[in-house]
Design a protein with these regions (language model features):
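ABC-type nucleotide-binding domain
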Residues: 1-166
Length: 166
């Protein structure tokens, strides 16, 4: 590849830069604790990770004290509401370890919703839309632009349509 994911992995300090510097709010990220830095970041990898528990507990993983309204808003932005509402238990639906009982696209939308529920300053989407169909991808990007306009969004994507209006 061209180093897109490597560059993205430098921001939350999964690796430290060997030359130069990366600044967040004008501060070299090496001068900020990893915990403090990662509190500012909502990171969604290409393969969304889910944990055993409920949909609700998965969405609260980054912000345990999120309100019901915040959780529902995050799901709506991530285009997850429609499939959540079809489940008999809705947000209390059990998720198997690794999310084996939901589709790839549903897993990605839940991982995206979890990052949104955290309400960080910076969102990093590392090819996080790849399992979404084109319509869902477009609707999700529009919602991100409308609802998260005060945040920094970094999007790595294979599809040119994903980043055209990012």
């Amino acid at each position: 590849g061209s180093g897109k994911s490597t560059l993205i992995n430098l921001i939350p300090r999964f690796f430290d830069v060997t030359e130069g510097e990366i600044l967040v709010d004008g501060v070299d990220i090496r001068n900020v604790s990893q915990h403090e830095l990662r509190e500012k970041i909502g990171y969604v990898p290409q393969k969304g990770v889910l944990f055993s528990g409920t949909i609700d507990s998965n969405l609260r993983y980054g912000k345990e004290d999120a309100t019901e309204k915040e959780i529902e808003k995050a799901a709506k932005i991530a285009q997850a509401t429609e499939f959540i509402e079809t489940k008999p238990e809705k947000y209390n639906t059990e998720i198997a370890q690794g999310g084996s009982n939901v589709s790839g696209g549903q897993k990605q939308r839940l991982a995206i919703a979890r990052a949104i529920a955290k309400n960080p300053e910076i969102y990093i989407f590392d090819d996080s839309f790849s399992a979404l169909d084109f319509k869902t991808d477009a609707t999700l990007r529009k919602a991100l632009n409308n609802e998260l306009s005060d945040s920094t969004l970094l999007i790595v994507a294979q599809r040119i349509s994903t980043i055209m209006k990012a």
